[in-house]
């Protein structure tokens, strides 16, 4: 993980590896990998984002681990805050953000409860526009989350899900190809290897023949 720089813009080649941060971005207790881009209007709290991943703007991400090469479209929400629906007489956040209303100290135990519902997103995941990943879910490597999907359950590797609540509608590859890709762990290749093999990434058959 590296320090962040601002604003979000194309940098000189020697600075490509530095995370690029847009305007009106709040980062609290978070870590960003190399080549990460965070576009405008985002709140990211207690989250780790892996190398080469990006957000497209207007995003909220809380208490999450995001893998490498993850594509996060506009208006995606990851781990929106649960309210105490069953535990308390009132659902309103005055019961745990009490200081904002002059009603005493905040309830730190409640925020610890939220942290326990961590979200994990694997590598090379594509999360479509306006999708929501609910607290506690895990999304496997290579998965696709459709536009406006609400993910309430774990999503398997290379699965394609869509809908409210999200359901599996297909797979990107067959089991054999998935196993070969997983074995390669290409997302862990160093930058020079990625650069050298970039043309091969653009053709699945060529890539599979050479590296899988």
What is each model feature region?
Residues 193-212:
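ABC ATPase nucleotide-binding domains
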Residues 164-173, 178:
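Short, charge-rich, low-complexity interaction segments located
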Residues 133-143, 149-152:
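Beta-rich strand-turn-strand
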Residues 8-9, 15-32, 37-135, 164:
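Flexible, glycine/small-residue-enriched loop-and-beta-strand segment within the central core
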Residues 112, 117, 185-199:
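Leloir-type glycosyltransferase catalytic cores
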Residues 82-83, 155, 171-173:
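Conserved catalytic-core motifs of eukaryotic protein kinase domains, centered on the activation segment
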Residues 145, 163:
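Conserved G/P- and acidic residue-centered "switch" motifs that form tight phosphate/ATP-binding loops
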């Amino acid at each position: 993980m590296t320090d962040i720089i601002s604003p979000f813009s194309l940098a000189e080649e020697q600075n490509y590896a530095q995370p690029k941060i847009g305007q009106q971005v709040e980062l609290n207790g978070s870590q960003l990998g190399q080549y990460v881009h965070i576009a405008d209007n985002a709140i990211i709290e207690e989250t780790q984002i892996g190398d080469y991943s990006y957000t497209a703007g207007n995003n909220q991400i809380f208490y999450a681990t995001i893998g490498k090469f993850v594509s996060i479209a506009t208006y995606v929400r990851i781990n929106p805050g649960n309210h105490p629906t069953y535990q308390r007489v009132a659902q309103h956040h005055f019961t745990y953000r009490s200081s904002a209303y002059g009603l005493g100290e905040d309830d730190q135990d409640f925020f610890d409860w939220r942290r326990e519902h961590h979200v994990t997103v694997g590598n090379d995941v594509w999360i479509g526009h306006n999708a929501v990943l609910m607290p506690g879910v895990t999304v496997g490597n290579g998965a696709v989350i459709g536009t406006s999907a609400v993910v309430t359950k774990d999503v398997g590797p290379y699965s394609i899900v869509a809908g409210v609540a999200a359901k599996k509608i297909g797979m990107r590859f067959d089991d054999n190809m998935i196993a070969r890709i997983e074995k390669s762990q290409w997302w862990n290749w160093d930058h020079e290897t990625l650069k050298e093999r970039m043309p091969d990434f653009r053709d699945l058959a060529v890539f599979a023949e050479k590296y899988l």
